[in-house]
Amino acid sequence: MKILEVSRYKNNFADHQLPFVTEQGEALRDAGCEVDYFLVRGNYLKAVKALKEKIRAFKPDIVHAHFGLSAITAELQSLVPVVTTFHNGETLNWHVNFMSSLMSLRAKHVIYVAQHIRDLSYFKARNYSIIPCGVPMEQMIITPKEEARKQLGWDANKKYILFGGAFNNLRKNYPLLRDAVEKLKADSSYIKHQTSDIVCVEMKGLSRAECVLRMCAADLFALPSHSEGSPQALKEAMAVNCPCIATDIADVRELFGEETGHWILRNPRPTKERWDADERSLDEMVNLLREALAFEGRTNGRERIIVMQLTNEQVAKRIIRVYESIIQ
């Protein structure tokens, strides 16, 4: 089976596309598919001609488009059936939502990485599946916490919270974590029982291996986002058994299940004036941090990822079943 993956050209990535697109393609190859890529550069409509040329040369059985705008390019060619995956960015802007979801009605099948993305789409595909992106388990190498800290030069006596993004990414909502940590550190009852300092570390400009090592070294992975698709970094933190705290968004509740070492915070809705936390959310975050930082152990998150069939290998098999249903 020949699959042509279509996505937007990204200048700041080694393969010029988002890592999970490349990794999904590699997993499909490992499962027996022949995979090639087409990257949309510039205008989405003007890219249709180049895509048709690529299709005639490669002769794929399926064109698989990632993200709604790339799907516009894919769905305007009429040579090969299209599968479209929505990753969440399509729902954040109403113009993009309208155009992406409208064009997705032309696709043979739509994959939403989480149910809420379909719920938020203006036009909802009838032929669809909920299939999150998978985790490259072979890269999720577990290093003992003490050893990981030695490699990073982290203080063994401090509490480290790994923030799931860059501090300046408003959607990731670092102000909530920052303010909660400061409030916790100022709490005399906490200081009485915890003499160690708390350090927040951002995930910015890091390789996959560098991120994984920090997940192994951290006491807690924090993702207080306002919006996510099916958060990859969170799944990766779980895959190395790092305790996690996240807002109740996307598929977080389903990911955590009833496993210990995972904490869920209600989603503090942003207003036009403020993206940071209201007092209720802040107090809740402080209480959850207090509990999470006292946990000190590791989780069974890796086993949870496997049970939920969220490894790249497992996800590839589910996607191939979608392809087969179209070709047959």
Pin down the residues of each PLM region.
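Acidic anion/phosphate-binding donor-loop and adjacent secondary structure
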Residues: 122, 135-151
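Short hydrophobic beta-strand element within catalytic cores of glycosyltransferases
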Residues: 243-246, 253
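Short His-centered aromatic/hydrophobic patch
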Residues: 65-70, 86
